[in-house]
Amino acid sequence: NWRKILGQIASVGAGLLGSLLAGYE
């Protein structure tokens, strides 16, 4: 199911982006 895969990629990407933003603060 490609939608499930895209959802997982999106959640991982959001987590990485959040950790990067948290690191800048």
From Swiss-Prot:
Lineage, broadest ranks: Eukaryota, Metazoa, Chordata, Craniata, Vertebrata
GO BP, one annotated term: defense response to bacterium
Complexes and interactors: Exists as aggregates of 3-4 molecules.
Keyword set, alphabetical order: Antibiotic, Antimicrobial, Cytolysis, Hemolysis, Secreted, Toxin
Similarity section: Belongs to the grammistin family. Group 3 subfamily.
Any one annotated GO CC term: extracellular region
Top-level division of the source organism's lineage: Eukaryota
Main localisation: secreted
Free-text function comment from the UniProt entry: Thanks to its abundant amphiphilic alpha-helices, it may integrate into membrane phospholipids, leading to lysis of the membrane. Has hemolytic activity. Has antibacterial activity with a broad spectrum against various species of bacteria including both Gram-positive and Gram-negative groups. Also has ichthyotoxic activity.
GO molecular function: toxin activity
Protein name, entry field: Grammistin Pp 3
Keyword Membrane in annotation: no
Natural source organism: Pogonoperca punctata
Expression sites by tissue: Expressed by the skin glands.
Annotated compartments: Secreted
